[in-house]
Amino acid sequence: MLDKETYYLKKMKMLMLHTFNMVLKTEEVALKETDLADVLSVAEMHTLVAVGRHEAKTMGTIAGELLINVSTLSIAINKLEKKGFVRRIRMEDDRRVVRIELTDKGRDALAQHEEFYYNLVEEVSSQMDDDEKKLFIQSLENMARFFEEKLDIQS
């Protein structure tokens, strides 16, 4: 028989892995149900999220948000640029600096992705009372803080 702490750890491990995989699978399925299914992968969609809706960002900033190196990001940005989702902007004052921004097509794709997550969170939280929602938020904040500290990330 397991002691209480071992039971909790095993249960949390199983639930974290299962939940992470189910969120990714749900995202894949939802993407396949859109007009973007044949055009964008989930990883490319996450890159669009990191590029963001508003002001253009440098490759270094985007790579930092995705926790990947700039050369890996370059490959993804090249593909997204060819597909018409992002554009590169060279700065007039320093032509070496390149910023990335979403095109209208990229903003439309991002809007679909944001709507998917809004609906997902709305569905999940509809099963919770206010106390459960507060506890869920607190738990997610604690997890986010743990991983940010573990990876030495400033939020």
Which positions does each model-derived feature cover?
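Charged, amphipathic alpha-helical coiled-coil/dimerization segments
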Residues: 78-135
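N-terminal helix-turn-helix DNA-binding core of bacterial DNA-binding proteins
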Residues: 27-69
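N-terminal leader segment of winged-helix/HTH proteins
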Residues: 1-39
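Short, locally clustered residues in the helix-turn-helix/winged-helix DNA-binding domain
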Residues: 49-53, 114, 141
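A specific heptad-register position in long alpha-helical coiled-coils used by two-component signaling proteins
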Residues: 21-24, 78, 107, 141, ...
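Regular, well-ordered alpha-helical segments
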Residues: 21, 25-28, 82, 126, ...
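Terminal interaction helix/tail motif
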Residues: 5-12, 19, 115-155
